Amino acid sequence: MAAFLTKHGYCGRRPPAQLLTRLRAAPPGLCGTVEVEARRDAVLALVGVLRALLAAIKDLDRSVVAHLGEHPDAEIFTSLPRSGQINAAQVLAEWGDCRPAYADAEAVACLAGATPVTKQSGKHTAVSFRWACNKRFRQAICTFADNSRHASPWAAKVYADALARGHDHPHAVRVLARAWIRVIWRCWIDQTPYDPAKHGAAHKLTEMATTAA
């Protein structure tokens, strides 16, 4: 049981022995033999479908990784902290490679749903969640942003500051994604990989940490 839980990333809230005891103490099912067999066959059929789907996903992932390096902008996105090959490819695919398509970094942030919508009428101003956007782009850039805070002190600080202002986790991740978009935009326009030493805010945090140590 312990090995099974570890393999599937169980949070560890309850010990394996307690979970096993609960499973064994569960009341018996009330279904008849015929229904039990039918349900078993249905579950096994779904397992077969899932196995085939997972195999296809792995094949596609291998293909993405194999061809990502052929794109001239690949190094920009793979140089980002904890972007990974697959996530970097997702962000690159949604971001695109047409420089004239975007006026500035804010245009990219709007497309990716990383910036809110502000509505003004007279003295009234309302800020709301941006529903109209490229949702695949938002998922890709927010996945990267969430991962990046575990490798970049600057990203971790932007996220922590957003939480301190009262934002919940999804909102804080979008705030971080918007900040990253401005950084990536500069790299993308200059056609140069990300370098923390050239990223002013990130470099300053690194220097402060080094001085404190």
Each predicted region: which residue ranges?
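A detector of single, family-specific signature residues
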Residues: 1-213
